[in-house]
């Protein structure tokens, strides 16, 4: 996407100007952390966080933290199986998809996941290994976005790039397994972009760090001051 070219230039410039810490709250699949490494940040300069189970399994695997700390439980899987990151991701993917089993595509994919379970797990392990080879050395915590941001607001050498949900309870809806997989979820508030983006900008208005935030909105209605924009539809 064109915004990634812009961000890459921005990140490269920030490094030249003395920024030594990169934060990715709402990390998702760690797209910004990958971009930070591509742009010149070292993994040990990167901090990522999220409140979702999926991202936390990935984050713990990449950073070498034991999954015991996440207290994972999943219908149809033993607790011991879930100590393996690739199996835990497989369980999440399977149970997340199962909520849509009434639709042909999802039903057929679930059958494929069952029949080729070991192949799917092997593929997930390979993905995790690739991510670890790039991001190994970074830090990850299951942590609320607001708490993570507050830690570095007064750090003039920190760069934050946040990409919060684009609709209310976006993460919750996407990552929902209907209770079939549970974990030691951190405390956090539901993010509603209608009010949350305004709160975000108000919170960082006097920050000493450099803060960038994704926002999806109509021209003239943004919470922050746009420095890059592109037309897009969902």
Task: Identify the role of each PLM range.
Residues 45-137, 167-179, 183-186:
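Class I S-adenosyl-L-methionine-dependent methyltransferase module
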């Amino acid at each position: 996407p064109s915004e990634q070219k812009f961000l890459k230039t921005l990140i490269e410039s920030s490094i030249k100007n003395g920024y030594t810490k990169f934060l990715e709250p709402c990390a998702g699949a760690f797209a910004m952390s990958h971009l930070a490494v591509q742009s010149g940040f070292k993994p040990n300069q990167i901090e990522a966080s999220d409140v979702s189970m999926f991202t936390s399994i990935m984050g713990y695997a990449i950073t070498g933290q034991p999954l015991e700390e996440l207290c994972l439980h999943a219908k149809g899987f033993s607790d011991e199986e879930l100590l393996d990151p690739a199996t835990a991701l497989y369980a999440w993917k399977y149970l997340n998809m199962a909520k849509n089993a009434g639709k042909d595509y999802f039903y057929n994919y679930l059958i494929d996941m069952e029949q080729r379970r070991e192949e799917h797990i092997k593929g997930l392990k390979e993905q995790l290994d690739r991510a670890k080879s790039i991001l190994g050395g970074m830090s990850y915590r299951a942590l609320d976005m607001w708490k993570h941001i507050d830690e570095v607001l007064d750090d003039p050498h920190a760069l934050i790039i946040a990409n919060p949900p684009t609709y209310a309870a976006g993460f919750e809806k996407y990552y929902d397994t209907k209770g079939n997989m549970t974990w030691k979820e951190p405390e956090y508030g539901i993010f509603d972009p209608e009010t949350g983006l305004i709160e975000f900008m108000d919170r960082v208005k006097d920050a000493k760090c450099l803060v960038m935030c994704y926002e999806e909105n109509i021209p003239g209605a943004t919470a922050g001051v746009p420095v890059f924009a592109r037309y897009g539809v969902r």
